[in-house]
């Protein structure tokens, strides 16, 4: 009975972290989609309007799609874990293996997307003097702040996915392989 309560507690904890990760990905996505700024610049006797938005660079587009993918995955797993958290059913070895592998995959994919967006943001903030690429953030401050917030929130989601990966690994290997390891140790100790 105590192990069932502990399992339910672990399931609720996992569901809470998954829901938080999903909400963080959605928040990061919304901030990135709203990252758009138009600036009027003087050009001779007139003005020209220049607009910068997330879709101008492939790094930000990649982060948008990965945020959608990770949020959908998190929501699907969250909904699929509700019956086991309520004690209605117990997830089997196959579903735990699937969650374990997909947690790893999505953690690394989100990490790559956040890394790509961070590099683009760094170039927008600092520029690159060797190639005479000017920094955009002094001119497009609102855009850079929105993208910075999106990348920071995405980084927190990466950390939470890494924690979920460790948690799903612990759940998988502890629940299904401890008994086999114990039996193997008992056999080896009885031989000596």
From Swiss-Prot:
Keywords: Cell membrane, Membrane, Transmembrane, Transmembrane helix. InterPro entries: CASP/CASPL (IPR006459), CASP_dom (IPR006702). It is found in: Cell membrane. Residues 33-58, 118-145 are extracellular. Residues 1-11, 80-96, 167-192 are cytoplasmic. PANTHER family: CASP-LIKE PROTEIN 2C1-RELATED, CASP-LIKE PROTEIN 4A4. Belongs to the Casparian strip membrane proteins (CASP) family. Homodimer and heterodimers. This is CASP-like protein 2U1.
